[in-house]
Amino acid sequence: MSLLIRSGPSLLTRTTKKTNTRQQSLVVRRKIRYFVGKKSYQEKTEQMKKTISLVIALISCLTIGAQEFQHYFTDATLRIDYTFTGNAKSQAIAVDELCKIPRWYGKRQRLAELPVEGNGQITVRDHRSQRVIYRNSFSTLFQEWLSYDEAKTSTKAFQNVFLVPYPKDTIDVTLDLKNNRRQTMATLTHTVAPADILIRRIGEKAVTPYETLQQAADTTRCIHIAYVAEGYTESEMPVFIDDCRTAMEALFAHEPFKSMRSRFNIVAVKATSEESGTSEPGRGIWKNTALHSNFNTFYSDRYLTTLHLKDLHDWLAGTPYEHIIVLVNTNNYGGGGILNSYNLSMTHHPAFKPVVVHEFGHSFAGLGDEYAYGKEEIPMYPHDIEPWEPNLTTLVDFNSKWADMVKEKTPVPTPQPATLGQPNAKKTHWETGAYEPAGYSQHGVYRPYPDCRMRTNENPEFCPVCQRAITRMINFYTDKQ
């Protein structure tokens, strides 16, 4: 990229000196003549013009993106803590607290674009012009809880934390929550003045100790991941670092992460717990840990999460992070992943590696679960609405998903291959199509491939559709095409 930027001015900058003009003319002619072949001089000239135009366009896009960020934001983070409250009938959003953190580790290009819709969006507008200057999408445990029967009879409140670049001038922040029909169910707009004396400054002192596990090739255009210790005591930190390396290598054993490894910057944050392990309410076990994680989320035995997002971000304040992977010191099976919130996984169960990668598929790329629970139906995806997840479809708008990857002769819906589920099954004849079940539903929701990391722990890789979705996400965050 830097070579292209340097070559631009030498070819395109005008000079008043005739000698320099003649030299530039010779350079251009030599460049043109380098494109050997039977093309005419005019064709070669046109080809060279197109090449130069592409270089100019690329440089312009990079420059405009950088100017946009520098015009509206400083190199710092505005952390906004919210409380989401309500039940199945009504929901509300309230601002809890504002914090300022040194440095900004999120995107600096494509600021107003969303790579996926998510179950909600945070939108930042310049207060004076009302121009959208930053957007991001997310999902939350609160919205998931609304789909359970408990939400029909009780009201609850959930913590949520969002990070946006710190503004230079006053901004309006809008938070929208969507239901499973992709309709807005709650919204809040509030104003933030960057000079507000009640914005708490954190992350400047007493930063949680951390180790850098991998440094990106370009730290200005990379994806920052922080592994966070949960349920590790002071004496167990060496075990945590080993677990981080295991999780990291498991992720980079999967394409497209493997091919794009240099775009990731990874640290291990040593959040120390008073007690080892995690809480297991189903067994009457409660532990005093850094993030207060627990099994039995929403009364599901293996659903391991934390509801204490403010504590999580307090531990992370001052460390280089955007995407969060919480590693829990337990040998019991469990985990969870929420888009642009966090990924949480047990570490000492035999399925640790596939689970931590699977959950990162949720939290990083917005991928949906491609399985169903036997005969149990969880009405997460209405069959008359196209899901926003890139690897799920109800066929309502299949063309917006992976229809372009399905061969013309492949039937849609697609029957399961006879070898699916068999040990050492040959996958050479497997094809991209639309397979049931998926999205916790036996019928009406479809996945792209017979098996995938988003479906089972046994499958060793992401399917072609998920790989494409992850590639697009990595390119989005690192501003690559």
Give the residues covered by each predicted segment.
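Fold-level signature of zinc-dependent metallopeptidase catalytic domains
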Residues: 197-255, 268-278
